C-alpha cells in the first residue's frame, strides 16, 4: 500500500519503475529459442503511458520512469533475432479506465477527499512531475460515466455503450496521432 489515492496515484508509481535489469536482447533470444516466430510489445496500456519517445504523450518511458525507449529496445532485439515485430496499443480505454481516480472515499477519515484524478499541471509545482499535466495521463476532464461508482460497470461499458461517457474529439485525435506516431517509428 502506497497510501491514500489523494496523496499517491499512478503518476507516483512511474518514477519507481526503473527497468534497470531489463534486457530485451536476452529475453527475445530466449523467446526465439523456445519457438517464437514473432514478438509483440505493449506500446501502452490503459495506464495511458507511452513506452516510446512519443511526440503526443509527454508521459512516456523516455521522459520519466526508466528513461528508456522500451519499444525501440524490443524492436531492435526482435529484428536482431529474425522475429516479426508488432506493437499493441490500449490507451483508447484510459478515458474510462481512470474514472476511479475522480472519486473519493465515501466513509472513514478521508471521506470526501478527492483522489488525484483531477490534478492539473499547476498542482505539480515543486513536485517531481512539475511541468507535466496529469490530465495528459489520466484524461479525466470529463463527467463520470453512468454507474461509475459501481466498480464492475466498466466491464459492461467496454464497447463504449451502457452509459459510458464517450471520449471527446480531442482525446480521439490524440490517440489517433499516437497510433500513427508508433507506426512511423521504424
Descriptions of predicted regions:
Residues 1-186:
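Mature catalytic domains of secreted/periplasmic carbohydrate-active enzymes
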Amino acid at each position: 500500500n502506497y497510501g491514500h489515492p489523494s496523496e499517491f496515484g499512478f503518476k507516483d508509481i512511474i518514477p519507481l519503475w526503473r527497468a534497470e535489469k531489463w534486457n530485451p536482447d536476452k529475453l527475445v533470444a530466449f523467446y526465439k529459442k523456445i519457438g517464437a516466430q514473432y514478438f509483440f510489445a505493449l506500446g501502452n496500456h490503459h495506464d495511458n503511458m507511452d513506452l516510446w519517445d512519443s511526440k503526443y504523450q509527454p508521459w512516456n518511458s523516455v521522459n520519466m520512469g526508466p528513461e528508456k525507449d522500451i519499444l525501440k529496445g524490443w524492436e531492435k532485439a526482435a529484428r536482431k533475432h529474425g522475429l516479426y515485430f508488432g506493437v499493441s496499443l490500449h490507451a483508447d480505454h484510459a478515458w474510462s479506465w481512470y474514472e476511479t481516480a475522480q472519486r473519493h472515499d465515501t466513509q472513514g477519515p478521508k471521506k470526501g477527499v478527492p483522489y488525484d484524478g483531477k490534478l492539473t499541471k499547476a498542482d505539480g509545482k515543486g513536485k517531481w512531475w512539475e511541468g507535466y499535466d496529469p490530465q495528459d495521463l489520466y484524461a479525466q476532464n470529463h463527467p463520470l460515466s453512468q454507474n461509475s461508482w459501481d466498480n464492475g460497470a466498466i466491464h459492461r461499458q467496454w464497447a463504449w455503450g451502457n452509459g459510458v461517457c464517450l471520449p471527446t474529439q480531442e482525446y480521439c485525435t490524440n490517440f489517433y496521432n499516437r497510433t500513427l506516431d508508433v507506426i512511423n517509428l521504424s
